[in-house]
Amino acid sequence: MNSIQLIIDIILILWILILTVLYFKRRQLNVDIVKNKKIIRAKRYIVFYVISEYKVKGDDLERVIRNSLKDLLGSVWLNIANPKVVTYREDTQEGIISTNRVGYKAVLASLPFAKEINNNKILIVPRRTTGSLKKAKKLIGLK
């Protein structure tokens, strides 16, 4: 009884395997990660502020944001999102992160993981995401 069931299982697996191979052969699947190149080029700007007891420099902040994204989702998403601190005001500890439309959610998700700069605890709080740099600068008080 068990040997008959084993033979039936093997036949079914082979049948499904043959159908799958034929399906993929006919379809000639070309999987593209991003079909529209405009999506990659479309920028998103994340307006944020930093809560910390000490003043934080913009270069250190960008390094920590990039490391947190790499730790959370890996170097592939770091290359896709490519976050950069465009503007950072040290007096008010507000700034703007530039990324693209594909990776801005990954950057937002990684911001809570940026917890420490030079052994000083920090918290990066995103305020708003916008599509234009002009509006982002207006939100932090720059022209």
UniProtKB/Swiss-Prot annotation:
It is found in: Cytoplasm. It catalyses: Endonucleolytic cleavage of RNA, removing 5'-extranucleotides from tRNA precursor. GO terms for cellular component: cytoplasm; ribonuclease P complex. It comes from the Archaea. The keyword Coiled coil does not apply. Its EC number is 3.1.26.5. The keyword Nuclease applies. Consists of a catalytic RNA component and at least 4-5 protein subunits. This is Ribonuclease P protein component 2.
